[in-house]
Amino acid sequence: MAKKSMIERDKKRKFLSAKYSIQRQQLKEQINQSLSLDEKAHLYRKLQSLPRNSAPTRITRRCFVTGRPKAVYRDFGLSRHVLREMAHACLLPGVIKASW
């Protein structure tokens, strides 16, 4: 189980990312459309003044059950440990062991 503080920190990052996403997108569009270097530099400074945790790359995918940040399958939102346990317990419909 992951630390509660790490899970809460990731929730805060998701909230900030959603809050500043429109503003960040508008600034990036203005940067692409601007012609002068001075204007671009000013817009880059405004973009950099946004909170660091509002960037979408700072968000970590975590397991829904354990909060584990590594080895998380996107299709299920579960870590490999929980995925294996749930698949063996037949809690994931349509998932079968591979055999060839």
UniProtKB/Swiss-Prot annotation:
List the coiled-coil residues. none
Q: Which InterPro entries match?
A: Ribosomal_uS14, Ribosomal_uS14_bac/plastid, Ribosomal_uS14_CS
Disulphide bonds in the chain:
none
Provide the transmembrane region boundaries. none
Q: Name one GO cellular component term.
A: chloroplast
Biological process (GO) annotations held by this record are: translation
| Record key words, sorted | Chloroplast, Plastid, Ribonucleoprotein, Ribosomal protein, RNA-binding, rRNA-binding
> GO molecular function of the protein, one example?
rRNA binding
Subunit record text? Part of the 30S ribosomal subunit.
Function, as annotated: Binds 16S rRNA, required for the assembly of 30S particles.
For this entry, the protein name equals Small ribosomal subunit protein uS14c
Q: Which gene encodes it?
A: rps14
